Amino acid sequence: MIREECLLKVLRAPHVSEKASTAMEKSNTIVLKVAKDATKAEIKAAVQKLFEVEVEVVNTLVVKGKVKRHGQRIGRRSDWKKAYVTLKEGQNLDFVGGAE
């Protein structure tokens, strides 16, 4: 069992984009920014514990940081990890519920 303190450090923020919104509507998948060293098992446990939903599968990828310029200086943003968390049939989690 993974300790609860570690679970709180795994999930960083929801990733809000057009692709993430489409994934939520079509395949009941939420997209999250997670800690770079987080495993699929830790992500699954954190989502189930914090949001009280059943997770079917977790897919992860590392997004490479962009090269940015500020004048003549060239820098690079940090890499970060993205997780696609597919919820089981009948489960629902709404991060971006609009004001009505």
UniProtKB/Swiss-Prot annotation:
InterPro entries: Nucleotide-bd_a/b_plait_sf, Ribosomal_uL23-like, Ribosomal_uL23/eL15/eS24_sf, Ribosomal_uL23_CS. Keywords: Ribonucleoprotein, Ribosomal protein, RNA-binding, rRNA-binding. GO terms for molecular function: rRNA binding; structural constituent of ribosome. GO terms for cellular component: ribonucleoprotein complex; ribosome. The keyword S-adenosyl-L-methionine does not apply. Pfam families: Ribosomal_L23 (PF00276). The keyword Transmembrane helix does not apply. One of the early assembly proteins it binds 23S rRNA. One of the proteins that surrounds the polypeptide exit tunnel on the outside of the ribosome. Forms the main docking site for trigger factor binding to the ribosome. Part of the 50S ribosomal subunit. Contacts protein L29, and trigger factor when it is bound to the ribosome. This is Large ribosomal subunit protein uL23. It comes from Shigella dysenteriae serotype 1 (strain Sd197).
